[in-house]
């Protein structure tokens, strides 16, 4: 992400993004890469029932702020983002649309989530080690045919933020790409089916699973609420599960304001 931000914006520029409390990645906040690049961030109004940016209000924000970068994508990513609508608003004000697909890249590649570069994103970033099952690393992708734009992206990565591409990782990524080409579609489909079944089973057992009206999830993630806002119930639940040998992620849910005492868990399948 820092490479893309370096390519697309200068210090002091405006950016819009999902807030950390609503599922945005820490790199999208002042505490992370956005702050390192010294960008001024405005966060999207959030639709808590649909667990996505409020489309009309977010489009208005984009038109009002006129950000250099319209950043979409989250680390809590239950459903495809309403990308076409946000991208249309962004392009009206000459804003570059950046899609952070780190957590859902394998689902995108498997054809079971959304297709960001065909839905309006100018740039997509992604991890090679999450739902895409390869060695640690990342991808920076664009469908633009503008060679000047390509050079900006390439130069931001090297010599901008990376000095080596780690050849041993390249070999591992080649194997992962070959395996994904052969088995990725079925693999991605199974991930989403398993997550949906898991969420439904938790709900049937009485757990408070978010986004019931939308079938809980369309990705590999499931969110559960374990107490009141800022109660720390999510942290306590994560500790109990860790003691039982199950590693989960305490997570802020909409309304939470304290990262270390959130009310929820993020579960990944």
Predicted regions and their residues:
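Short helix/strand-bridging catalytic loops that position acidic/His residues to coordinate divalent metals
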Residues: 112, 268-269
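Hydrophobic, well-ordered secondary-structure elements that form the walls
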Residues: 241, 267
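Broad gene-expression machinery/nucleic-acid interaction feature
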Residues: 38, 137, 221, 264-266
């Amino acid at each position: 992400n820092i490479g893309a931000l370096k390519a697309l914006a200068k210090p002091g520029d405006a950016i819009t993004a999902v807030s950390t409390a609503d599922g945005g990645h820490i790199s999208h906040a002042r505490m992370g890469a956005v702050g390192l690049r010294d960008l001024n961030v405005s966060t999207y109004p959030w639709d808590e029932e649909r667990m996505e940016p409020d489309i009309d209000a977010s489009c208005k924000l984009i038109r009002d702020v006129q950000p250099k970068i319209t950043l979409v994508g989250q680390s809590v990513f239950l459903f495809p983002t309403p990308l076409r609508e946000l991208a249309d608003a962004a392009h009206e004000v000459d804003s570059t649309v950046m899609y952070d697909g780190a957590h859902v890249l394998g689902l995108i590649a498997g054809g079971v989530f959304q297709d960001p570069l065909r839905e309006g994103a100018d740039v997509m970033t992604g991890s090679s080690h999450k739902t895409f099952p390869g060695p640690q690393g990342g991808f920076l992708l664009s469908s633009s045919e503008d060679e000047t734009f390509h050079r900006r992206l390439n130069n931001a990565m090297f010599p901008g933020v990376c000095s080596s591409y780690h050849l041993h990782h390249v070999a591992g990524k080649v194997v992962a790409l070959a395996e994904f080409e052969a088995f990725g579609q079925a693999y991605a489909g199974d991930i989403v089916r398993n997550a949906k079944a898991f969420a439904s089973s938790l709900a049937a057992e009485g757990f408070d699973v978010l986004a019931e009206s939308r079938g809980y999830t369309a990705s590999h993630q499931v969110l559960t609420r374990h107490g009141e806002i800022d109660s720390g119930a999510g942290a306590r639940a994560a500790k109990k599960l860790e003691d039982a040998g199950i590693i989960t992620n305490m997570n802020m849910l909409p309304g939470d304001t304290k990262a270390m005492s959130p009310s929820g868990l993020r579960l990944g399948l």
